[in-house]
Amino acid sequence: MRKFLTLFVVSFFSLTSIVSAEVDFAGKTITWVVPFKEGGGTSRFARFIQPFLTKYLPGNPDIQVMHIPGGGAIKGSNYFQENAKADGTFLFGCSTSVIVNVATGNPLVKYNLSEYRPVLLLPQNTHWFTRSDLATEPHDLSKLIERDLVLYALKTPASADLFHIWVFDKLGLKGAKPIPGLSSSGGYQAFLRGEIHISSHGAANYVKKVKPEIEQGKVVDLMTLGIIGADGSVSRNPLAPDAPTFPEMYEKINGKKLEGDDLEAFYSIGAAWSQASKSMLLPENTPDEIVDVFREAARKMVNDPEFKEKASKALGPFPLIIGEEAGEIVKKAAIFSETTKDQLNAVLKKNRFTYQVQ
């Protein structure tokens, strides 16, 4: 019996080694499709990871980043769906914008995002802040809640900016009014000029642009979205550890914990807006052995001394999510429940938008 078990174990690991050995990208070129222009956040994410992935994939393949911007990321995303081969020679650079197109039912979407095979996710986080004259102290919304008019930027209700409308509604900012067509960068400039009352940024721009204003006393933190763990717990953002998370602020304002349909909506929004902010995906139907090889390369990459040294500055302080957990997050982000859609549509209607989540 012992001899049989020994033979079984040896045979099993030999078979595993054979399967891994069969995945070899020597002499091959991998095309990483990024549905945005060169120089944007998803582009920088791909180009930072590119040399490390080449280093740790078997055969050290050449990886070329292909930018296909247009249509709010739909042009490049549809191209990937229609042209990518499930043999490990195509990668997709996904972002919140790509996910929102699916989750909100954009009829132009042809890509089957929820069936793609995630290799890794790069979480990000949203910081909200206001001018110091509009808050009694940091993390205080009382003055903004009392105002009849609280202006903020909104690029389009069909983008991730939709989530701002939901957040402000849940916090009782009755005077909150979006200015459609104003991008995040344009909105921040308008904020600095005193033309709008509340603004937000992701991690990189928060550190680069907002923190200096906070240190000069011109701007104060309000809150962050929060870091959502695999168990559903929400922790504070290490870049602003004193700032409450959205669930904390919700409880402070409403006198009760975030729960039920509101909590479900928050988890879906958090998955799309934070946990899966940037990601590297393989096409649907990619064989498990190829997916495993990419994930193993990603695990080796994050332990590379050079990667560790440079990643915090290039990617932010949040650890990459690798493997099966990443797949569950992408599905949660891309498929909104009917109750979540109802909540989003209700706040859209309240703000007089004709656009509706499908």
Task: Identify the meaning behind each predicted range.
Residues 6-16:
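Bacterial N-terminal signal peptides
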Residues 21-116, 156-160, 170-213, 302-321, ...:
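N-terminal (or domain-start) structured segment
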Residues 39, 96, 126, 131-136, ...:
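Short coil/turn segments
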Residues 89-92, 108-127, 151-153, 221-222, ...:
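A structural signal for short loop-to-beta-strand junctions that line the ligand-binding cleft
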Residues 99-107, 121-135, 165-166, 170, ...:
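Periplasmic solute-binding protein
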Residues 114-155, 172:
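A conserved helix-loop-strand patch within extracytoplasmic ligand-binding domains
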Residues 210-302, 350-358:
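C-terminal lobe and pocket-closing loops
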Residues 271-339:
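Secondary-structure end/capping motifs
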